[in-house]
C-alpha cells in the first residue's frame, strides 16, 4: 500500500512539472535542466577526505582512522586504530 502511494505521488509530481512547463509557453521542456539540478543534489559533496565506504586510490584519500582497501572496487575502510 505504501509503495503504491509513493508511486502515485511521483507520477503526479512528474505530471505537474510537465504541465507547468507547458503553461509557461516554453517550446522546450525544462527536463534536462531539471535533471541536471537533481544530479547535483544526489552527488556526494567534495570533501578533503573520503568517508567510510567512499572510493579511494590511496590511504591519504581516506579520512582519519580509515585506510584504502584495494579490493575491487577500492573503498575506505577502518584501519583498526582509535583515538581523537
UniProtKB/Swiss-Prot annotation:
<feature type="disulfide bond">
    <location>
        <begin position="49"/>
        <end position="63"/>
    </location>
</feature>
<feature type="signal peptide">
    <location>
        <begin position="1"/>
        <end position="21"/>
    </location>
</feature>
<feature type="propeptide">
    <location>
        <begin position="22"/>
        <end position="47"/>
    </location>
</feature>
<keyword id="KW-0732">Signal</keyword>
<keyword id="KW-0872">Ion channel impairing toxin</keyword>
<feature type="modified residue" description="Valine amide">
    <location>
        <position position="82"/>
    </location>
</feature>
<feature type="disulfide bond">
    <location>
        <begin position="56"/>
        <end position="68"/>
    </location>
</feature>
<dbReference type="GO" id="GO:0090729">
    <property type="term" value="F:toxin activity"/>
</dbReference>
<comment type="function">
    <text>Probable ion channel inhibitor.</text>
</comment>
<keyword id="KW-0800">Toxin</keyword>
<keyword id="KW-0960">Knottin</keyword>
<keyword id="KW-0964">Secreted</keyword>
<keyword id="KW-0027">Amidation</keyword>
<dbReference type="GO" id="GO:0008200">
    <property type="term" value="F:ion channel inhibitor activity"/>
</dbReference>
<dbReference type="GO" id="GO:0005576">
    <property type="term" value="C:extracellular region"/>
</dbReference>
<keyword id="KW-1015">Disulfide bond</keyword>
<dbReference type="InterPro" id="IPR011696">
    <property type="entry name" value="Huwentoxin-1"/>
</dbReference>
<protein>
    <recommendedName>
        <fullName>U21-theraphotoxin-Cg1a 2</fullName>
    </recommendedName>
</protein>
<dbReference type="Pfam" id="PF07740">
    <property type="entry name" value="Toxin_12"/>
</dbReference>
<comment type="similarity">
    <text>Belongs to the neurotoxin 10 (Hwtx-1) family. 05 (F4a) subfamily.</text>
</comment>
<feature type="disulfide bond">
    <location>
        <begin position="62"/>
        <end position="76"/>
    </location>
</feature>
